[in-house]
């Protein structure tokens, strides 16, 4: 299968500072791919290169498909109405008027902000402004959706809403590549990840192949409810010893060990 995104030995300098150091990865159709790392790891620079915003670099970058991009810096026309901003970006993408109108209504309803259609951007909460910015990235029905820190500034309810929408995009065959520095956001979302440290790729592959296997277990111990997350092997022993008293057993994966030296 031909990858939707192919990157080989990507290197980028800002002045004398090397911010990306020969990173390589591939992303396939219908995949949710994550870039994970602390601030300054090189995530945003990588996504800006994929989106065509940064053009000067060394290495090979191939992107096969129409792109939608949610930047880390949320920049919308604050004095404009939501509907006018979305119309502008739809027109910029070459959409017909009927397509734009239909897409606007669909996404405003999907993200539960249809009541703000005629509100000015500056009148919206930061969370709702971010939802509008997300719509900008998908209004033109792109093949590839690039999301830089998509959950930043959202409350728990809206994080879940956006996660569900990302999963739906995947089911439609869209390719999604997103960045985050929050482990819990990526462990249960991405099919594969690239973990960056100071511009270098330190791990690349499926979550279960690069993470420490853990388990969350709830059980009764002499009538007392115990809840804890422990290494998988330890949890299995408890499960065997207290099978009748185990209330919940859930396999999880931890990436924490990868960041201990940061």
Swiss-Prot record:
InterPro entries per UniProt: AAA+_ATPase, ABC_transporter-like_ATP-bd, ABC_transporter-like_CS, ABC_transporter_ATP-binding, P-loop_NTPase
Molecular function terms from GO: ATP binding; ATP hydrolysis activity
Domain of life: Archaea
Keyword Plastid: no
Domain (ABC transporter): residue spans on this chain: 5-223
Keywords, alphabetical: ATP-binding, Nucleotide-binding, Transport
Residues bound to ATP: 37-44
Pfam families: ABC_tran (PF00005)
Family of this protein: Belongs to the ABC transporter superfamily.
Protein name (database record): Uncharacterized ABC transporter ATP-binding protein MJ1023
Organism whose genome encodes this protein: Methanocaldococcus jannaschii (strain ATCC 43067 / DSM 2661 / JAL-1 / JCM 10045 / NBRC 100440)
